[in-house]
Design a protein with these regions (language model features):
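Beta-rich, blade/repeat-based domains predominating
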Residues: 41-54, 82-94, 105-106, 122-136, ...
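Conserved beta-strand element within WD40/beta-propeller blades
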Residues: 59, 99-100, 139-140, 180, ...
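Blade/loop signatures of beta-propeller domains
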Residues: 21-34
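A short loop-to-beta-strand structural motif that recurs across blades of beta-propeller domains
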Residues: 66-69, 105-109, 146-149, 186-188, ...
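Short loop/turn segments that connect beta-strands within beta-propeller blades
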Residues: 70-75, 110-115, 150-155, 190-195, ...
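A short beta-strand motif characteristic of beta-propeller blades
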Residues: 35-40, 75-80, 115-120, 156-162, ...
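Bacterial N-terminal signal peptides
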Residues: 8-23
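Short loop/turn segments immediately following the C-termini of beta-strands
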Residues: 62, 102, 142, 182-183, ...
């Protein structure tokens, strides 16, 4: 098992603000902000959502320490139990599911035969996770204020972002930049050269859920306002989904492009199409 606290840092980026990027000054409702449809309830604090290419939906069910699978026909089952505070969830190119344990400080892989293997340990409240184009696992290592990039085959890690404000979500963009949502109030784009662009001025409190939307924008949960925003790199922030019951936390994308949102308080997963 890999003990990340004892690992030497392979690569650390230095950060500098991007002076030439626009500040976030434009805030608006989307052209057609949508009202979500409740698909499923009975969860206990759904925190992460990932969708397999075959349409199977996986939900990290924080309050029950389980990972739930919802088949295309709606059948639900627990594929993993006893995970302390399961948070982020991601599926690799082979269809293998990975989950972060926020309270256990580890990342676990769910193997095709139903067994599970810890691939990295001794993290610092790992929250949102996502795969990079290179197949590395990106981890929002919340308590350490950093983003890690982990080789899922051996658990070796490197720090790719530091000095963040309680990062809870991360996604990679087509240009190789990373965007991270932070519970401390920031949404930050980190370019490959280490420079940063702040995008979160319109947020009440960014949440775990974050997804890319094309090459130059992201969908992000605004946990403090119970809605989903779309933030583009040109400085525009728009409300795209509102009207949730409970506190929006998780964000996933269905195979048809609809957004899936998990809410705390009501223990539900919602679906909403995005109107352009």
């Amino acid at each position: 098992m890999t003990h990340l606290r004892s690992l030497a840092v392979v690569s650390v980026l230095a950060f500098a603000p991007i002076a030439d990027f626009p500040t976030l000054i434009t805030t608006a409702a989307y052209a057609n902000p949508t009202t979500p449809e409740k698909l499923w309830d009975g969860f206990n604090a759904p925190t992460g959502i990932a969708v397999h290419s075959d349409g199977t939906v996986y939900v990290s069910n924080w309050g029950d320490s389980t990972v739930e699978r919802i088949a295309a026909d709606g059948t639900r089952s627990a594929v993993l139990r006893g995970v302390p505070s399961p948070a982020g969830i991601a599926i690799d190119a082979e269809g293998t599911v990975f989950v972060s344990s926020y309270s256990g400080d580890y990342i676990v892989r769910i193997n095709p035969d139903g067994s599970h293997t810890r691939i990295a340990e001794n993290l610092a409240t790992p929250t949102g996770i996502a795969f990079s184009a290179e197949g590395r696992l990106l981890v929002a290592n919340r308590a350490a204020g950093e983003i890690l990039s982990i080789d899922p085959s051996n658990g070796l890690a490197r720090v790719v972002a530091r000095s963040l404000s309680l990062p809870v979500g991360v996604t990679e963009m087509a240009d190789g930049s990373l965007v991270t949502s932070q519970y401390g109030g920031r949404v930050t784009r980190i370019l490959p050269d280490g420079s940063m662009q702040e995008l979160g001025e319109s947020f009440s409190r960014p949440g775990v859920g974050i997804l890319s939307d094309g090459p130059d924008a992201v969908f992000v949960i605004d946990n403090g306002a119970a809605l989903v925003r779309r933030v583009s790199f040109n400085g525009r922030s728009e409300v795209v989904v509102e009207g949730f019951e409970g506190s929006a936390v998780a964000l996933g994308r269905a195979t048809n492009g609809d957004l899936l949102v998990g809410t705390w308080g009501t223990g539900a997963v919602y679906r909403t199409p995005i109107s352009r």
